[in-house]
């Protein structure tokens, strides 16, 4: 007789409580995806460079039109809170100090991908679409020859 093991999925609230309790170290790079706490890939120099270039372009947009977010959490559902590379958000007077943005507040979301293309394309982008984010760019960094 075999027993099927059940995974314990976490909510965003539980995830935040774990963080506040110090379960994650200051340098831990994790995000909550579909109830699972996943370690994020290390940021390569090419990835960081691409994000910086995007910031340089988007920084020119006046803040009364959009707030620029970089690797900040977006609460998609009760069990999913990814940290996309770049987002443009609807302006808010408090700059989202009281709560992380939700899908209806996202104007544009960009994921830069080099080592996690399959996961970003097959898991993250569909999650963004299901949550109602209207504009998502998956920026795939090609390997140079």
Task: Give residue ranges: language-model regions.
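Gly/Pro/Ser/Thr-rich low-complexity, intrinsically disordered segments predominantly at protein N-termini
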Residues: 1-145
